[in-house]
Amino acid sequence: MELLLLSNSTLPGKAWLEHALPLIANQLNGRRSAVFIPFAGVTQTWDEYTDKTAEVLAPLGVNVTGIHRVADPLAAIEKAEIIIVGGGNTFQLLKESRERGLLAPVADRVKRGALYIGWSAGANLACPTIRTTNDMPIVDPNGFDALDLFPLQINPHFTNALPEGHKGETREQRIRELLVVAPELAVIGLPEGNWIQVSNGQAVLGGPNTTWVFKAGEEAVALEAGHRF
């Protein structure tokens, strides 16, 4: 399988997806036809989100079609060489994808050679479940099971920092709560600017920041760029 799982879409001082474009270009391998799944978008319309994505990827020669715009979404997925899933609200993304019957076809197409690109909520969707999203559950997705393309759980936008005076839980504390009730899971705390690239059977960590892996009953393990999962 070929996956590019990004923690986020924007870095300070850079344009939207700017930091990801070289990664995407490197993994295209001649692929040009893409479908975009915009359902995580809530405060922007799906048309706006699709057009924005198409515009930024056009210089790479990628032709982007919004899955919500086609008459036969399953046929579009079958024909796609690239499947792109944007960030936003993960619960909304999973709900719409499940109700439209897209989860199994997307997973199957990626397993048969399509490149999967997802940022934030799109990275969450590639995991076994969405239980490590940071998002508010604004809708009920009728279950948390997701695409299960990547075997570990990802927590995107990971930071353990708290504003001065803030008394809420740290991100690690929230992840530890999950590991109490689901000790079989391993969770990757993927900070902004980092990514996981899967190609030729290898999953490799990239990015400038320390990534953390959390497992039940164990201390967090720090990982740096180049680590192979």
Curated annotation (Swiss-Prot):
CDD domains: GAT1_Peptidase_E. One of its GO terms (molecular function) is dipeptidase activity. InterPro entries: Class_I_gatase-like, Peptidase_S51, Peptidase_S51_dipeptidase-E. Keywords: Cytoplasm, Dipeptidase, Hydrolase, Protease, Serine protease. Coiled coil: none annotated. The active site is at S120, D135, H157. It is found in: Cytoplasm. The keyword Cytoplasm applies. Pfam families: Peptidase_S51. It comes from the Bacteria. Its main location: cytoplasm. Its EC number is 3.4.13.21. One of its GO terms (biological process) is proteolysis. Hydrolyzes dipeptides containing N-terminal aspartate residues. May play a role in allowing the cell to use peptide aspartate to spare carbon otherwise required for the synthesis of the aspartate family of amino acids. Belongs to the peptidase S51 family. This is Peptidase E. It comes from Salmonella newport (strain SL254).
